[in-house]
Curated annotation (Swiss-Prot):
Catalyzes the NADPH-dependent reduction of L-glutamate 5-phosphate into L-glutamate 5-semialdehyde and phosphate. The product spontaneously undergoes cyclization to form 1-pyrroline-5-carboxylate. Its main location: cytoplasm. This is Gamma-glutamyl phosphate reductase. Its EC number is 1.2.1.41. The gene is proA. CDD domains: ALDH_F18-19_ProA-GPR (cd07079). It comes from Desulfosudis oleivorans (strain DSM 6200 / JCM 39069 / Hxd3) (Desulfococcus oleovorans).
Length: 418
């Protein structure tokens, strides 16, 4: 069978299974999630044996230590995947919830009701844990899912797929509700992106190159964020101690994630009070600064920021720093160089905070809090499948509700239109 035929068969099976999943009772979905959590522990040795094949191949091809770390399915990773499934099982089921109801003058009762999106395709790199995490979220929201992981994790993902299928069968759900693309060839991705007849949404998770490839080649709607160029703006009347704590956390806690700060903007009237102490704190943590001319006048030992630095998602202990003349200049900088991901203002002015919230066009905008809070769990959404900087169909962290849509339901008693 050709790769194209394999993908078409997978997509058709997912579409068929979506009909059953759309009306699957909550308790049955939860049962499947809990069964999968238990089976992950039972199948741990088999999963790790397959993972070892991927790790050996990765080392032989010179994959970086960071990539190998993401690829490794340790006991802790298995426990984390199982715990995540149990957490999803405990979350409220969005399917069937009515968000608004009203009665028309002719007696028709109209409501909006949440329903699954249908078939979701997820294309991702390296991390085998995404296979289980994504499957759990999609199932709880009543969707079916086609998972295409990176070729470097093929053995691991096949093993996880077998565990998922066994759990679905045990719980009486369609085994094709979760399918892993079984071939490593990149041609499979191209064919997957052409299945608009069967797949309702594509979610890519990975580097900017992968995401741009998916967007350019997909005939199916895509939810994505290319990168996280996140900003913190320190206003003229900010509490300096608070600002330093927020900036340090936003850059240093986990510099390799998409909600880490990449550019620091400081009001000119606060720069002298803020930057020297902040720079010393960053230096102690190994953060390399790249600054504009005004920044370098205060911090002469740092590198000069080039134009490319303002666009950069470093994912490392590197930070671009710019002194701005006003909050409006900070907002303009974010509009020019930002990626619609996460932005922060540190200020004691309520009016400026509210204006910043209204003017900045990003998926999460915070006042006096770290960029690191752009996360489904931290915002009270529960688990998330990713962060979207697309405004259609979701903007920001995508939890269970964002994996559903709404339809209108109308109850009548014989009304006809005159």
């Amino acid at each position: 069978m050709t790769i194209e035929a394999t993908i078409v068969d997978i997509a058709k099976a997912a579409k068929k299974a979506a009909l059953a999943m759309a009306t699957c009772p909550t308790d049955k979905k939860n049962q499947a999630l809990l069964a999968l959590a238990d089976r992950l522990h039972k199948d741990a040795a088999l999963i790790q044996a397959e993972n070892k094949k991927d790790l050996e191949a990765a080392k032989a091809t010179g994959l970086s230590s960071a990539m190998i770390d993401r690829l490794t399915v340790s006991d802790a990773v298995i426990a984390s995947m199982a715990d995540g499934l149990r957490e999803v099982a405990a979350l409220p089921d969005p399917v069937g919830a009515k968000s608004a109801t009203w009665r028309r003058p002719n007696g028709l009762e109209v409501a909006r009701m949440r329903i699954p999106l249908g078939v979701i395709g997820i294309i991702y790199e390296s991390r085998p844990n995404v296979t289980v995490d994504a499957a759990g979220l999609c199932l709880k929201a009543g969707n079916t899912v086609i998972l295409r992981g990176g070729s470097e994790a093929l053995h691991s993902n096949r093993a996880l797929a077998a565990t998922i299928s066994a759990s679905l069968a045990e719980s009486g759900l369609p085994e094709t509700a979760v399918q892993v693309v079984p071939v490593a060839d990149r041609e499979a991705v191209t064919h997957l992106l052409a299945q608009e007849e069967y797949i309702d949404l594509i979610i890519p998770r990975g580097g900017e190159g992968l995401i741009r490839f998916v967007v350019q080649h997909s005939s199916i709607p895509v939810l994505k964020h290319y990168k996280g160029v996140c900003h913190v703006y320190v206003d003229q009347d900010a509490d300096m101690e608070m600002a330093r704590a927020i900036c340090f956390n936003a850059k240093v806690q986990r510099p390799g994630v998409c909600n880490a700060m990449e550019t620091l903007l400081v009001h000119r009237d606060a720069a002298q009070r803020f930057l020297p102490d902040m720079a010393r704190q960053f230096a102690d943590a190994g953060v390399a600064l790249r600054g504009c001319a005004a920044t370098r006048a205060l911090l002469p030992g740092i590198e000069t920021a080039e134009e490319a630095d303002w666009y950069a998602e470093y994912l490392d202990l590197i930070l671009a720093v710019k002194v701005v003349d006003s909050m409006d200049a900070a907002i303009s900088h974010i509009a020019t160089y930002g990626s619609s991901h996460t932005e922060v203002i540190v200020t004691n002015s309520y009016d400026r905070a509210m204006r910043f919230l209204a003017a900045v066009d990003s998926s999460v905008v915070l006042v006096n809090a770290s960029t690191r809070f752009n996360d489904g769990g931290q915002l009270g959404l529960g688990a998330e499948i990713g962060i979207s900087t697309s405004k259609l169909h979701a903007f920001g962290p995508m939890g269970l509700e964002e994996l559903t849509t709404t339809k209108f339901i109308v109850l009548g008693n014989g009304q006809i239109r005159e």
